[in-house]
Structures are given as C-alpha cells and as structure tokens.
Amino acid sequence: MNAGATSVRKRSAGNFVLCDQGLEMMRGAMAAAKKINSKMLWTPHLGSLALAHARAGQAEAALHLLSEALAAVEDMGERMFEAELHRIIGDVLLSVQRQGEAQVEFTRAIAIARQQQAKSWQLRAAISLARLWRDQGKMVEARELLAPVYGWFTEGFDTRDLKDAKALLEGLA
C-alpha cells in the first residue's frame, strides 16, 4: 500500500478504518476495474469495500454493496467467497441491531461453507454466530456450535480466527 493510501487510514479498536478519502479511493479503484471489465476477484473486493463502509458507520451503503456482490456471485459463478459475504452481511446487520436477520445470514454462511468444505469460512461464521448467541445468553448453544469447528484445526493457532475462537470458547466455559 502506498504512503498516500496509508495516510487515509486510522487505527480503531485493533482494526483499520478508512476515512472518507480512503473510501473514495477504494470506490475509484473499483470503478476503474469495472470500466475495463476486470472482474477478477470482484466479489471479495466488493466485500472489502462494504466492510470499509460498515466500519465508517454506513451500514446501508455496505448492505447495498454486499447485495451487489451476491448478485455477482450468481452472475459469474464466483462462489469461493460466498459464505464470507453472508457472514459479513450478518456483521453489518448486527451493527444496526438487526439480530434476527444477522442470525439467518450467519446460519446461511455456515451452511454454504459446510457444503463447500471451506473450513476457514465455516470457522469465521461459527465465531460470528457464537458471539451473537453468547450476547443473547445462549452459552451452551454457542459452545456446542463453535467447539467442534475449532477442534478440526491442527495448526495455524497463531492466526486471528483461531485466536478469536479460542478466546470465545474460554469465555463460554
């Protein structure tokens, strides 16, 4: 990332959040790619832009981009990131207090990841749903969901996802 792009980020709660200028840069890059009909990794790029909007407090813009990403999944058949897109939708919905809809998206993400045998995506979605259930007081359900998924992994325990899963499971004990 160049110095100009780096300067438009700010650090917040362990995550980078793009300021307005950074969002504009991302939108410009996406528009340029679209203009030349470059669709390589289009859905994850839309997902990243949606996350940036969500972190900037622009949930509706994020949901619009995620809807566009899911339409691209259908149009192009680029399903590799489909489960993650549903998980991100769930996170955005949670940010605007739409827990029921978020749970549906997390469950859908888990089902898609399971069907694709995408264990990392399934772990992420299980973490998100387990957090929601924990926050709703459903400790047993959260643990029963997450523990077996976490148990599949035999390496990579220094990754953010596995660290998050371990910490969540310890909190559910």
Regions found by a protein language model. Name each.
Residues 1-173:
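Helix-coil-helix junctions within alpha-helical repeat/solenoid scaffolds
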